[in-house]
């Protein structure tokens, strides 16, 4: 029998096609719904393959700390040498636009002029560096949530 596949997520909608595919292929799997939990670090994780489907937009579904908890679980899996698809690095990129842009640039992919600003006053200050239209996007959102277009700084 193949090793069990553990699907790490916090959004059941995203797992529907996986459930069907795994059932069709007769692959054993288990879902780890990580919107919250307790990790006993001294206990080794089960053997298997871990597929990380955690999303930066989890907070939009009421799961504010799911990425942080998933990061903890991934570190635990890594410390035991478990195979993880979409590992800690993937999660880091998921929750950090600057890290995403840096990774894209290492492959020669251009990214827009970017300022990282935290706090309302700092966002306004960063906006003053643009002479025309600009777009804001926060680190944690999917489906275009939080994207705003401004025609000017005022």
Which residue ranges define each predicted feature?
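Small/polar loops that bind or transfer phosphate-bearing groups
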Residues: 7-10, 151
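Active-site nucleotide/adenylate-binding loops and adjacent lid/helix of ATP-dependent enzymes
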Residues: 79-81, 88-154
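Conserved N-proximal alpha/beta basic substrate-recognition cap immediately N-terminal to
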Residues: 10-113
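Extreme N-terminal starter segment of soluble prokaryotic enzymes
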Residues: 1-6
């Amino acid at each position: 029998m193949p090793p069990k596949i553990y699907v790490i997520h916090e959004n059941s909608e995203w797992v529907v096609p996986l459930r069907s595919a795994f059932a069709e292929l007769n692959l054993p799997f288990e879902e780890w719904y990580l919107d919250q939990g307790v990790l006993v670090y001294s206990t080794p994780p089960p053997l298997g393959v871990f597929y990380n489907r955690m999303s930066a937009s989890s907070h939009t579904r009421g799961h504010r700390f799911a990425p942080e908890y998933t990061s903890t679980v991934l570190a635990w899996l890594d410390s035991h040498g478990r195979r993880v698809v979409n590992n800690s690095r993937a999660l880091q990129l998921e929750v950090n636009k600057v890290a995403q842009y840096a990774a894209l640039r290492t492959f020669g992919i251009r990214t827009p002029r970017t300022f990282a600003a935290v706090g309302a006053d700092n966002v306004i200050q960063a906006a003053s560096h643009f002479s025309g239209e600009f777009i804001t996007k926060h680190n944690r959102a999917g489906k275009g949530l939080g994207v705003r277009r401004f025609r000017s700084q005022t």
